[in-house]
Curated annotation (Swiss-Prot):
NCBIfam families: S18 (TIGR00165). The lineage of its organism: Bacteria, Bacillati, Actinomycetota, Actinomycetes, Frankiales. This is Small ribosomal subunit protein bS18B. One of its GO terms (molecular function) is small ribosomal subunit rRNA binding. Belongs to the bacterial ribosomal protein bS18 family. GO terms for cellular component: cytosolic small ribosomal subunit. Part of the 30S ribosomal subunit. Forms a tight heterodimer with protein bS6.
Length: 73
């Protein structure tokens, strides 16, 4: 059985120093359709950048730029 290829952290590859909470288009990629923050093994981020993404998403939710949950049906 072959091992799946390991995902490369996008932020490390692009040498991103700071993940801005105001960049909602970037942060929406790391939120599920239910509004949850995607896991590191799903998103492919390294541990440091996953923490930074989580903090940015939480700040963005606090500032009402991103929703806490998915929209009701």
């Amino acid at each position: 059985m072959r091992k799946p290829k390991k995902k490369v952290c996008v932020f490390c590859k692009d040498k991103v120093e700071y993940i801005d909470f105001k960049d909602t288009s970037l942060l929406r990629k790391y939120i599920s359709d239910r509004g949850k923050i995607r896991a590191r093994r799903v998103s492919g981020n390294c541990s440091q950048h996953q923490r930074d993404v989580a903090t940015a998403v939480k700040n963005s939710r606090e500032m009402a730029l991103l929703p806490y949950t998915a929209s009701a049906r």
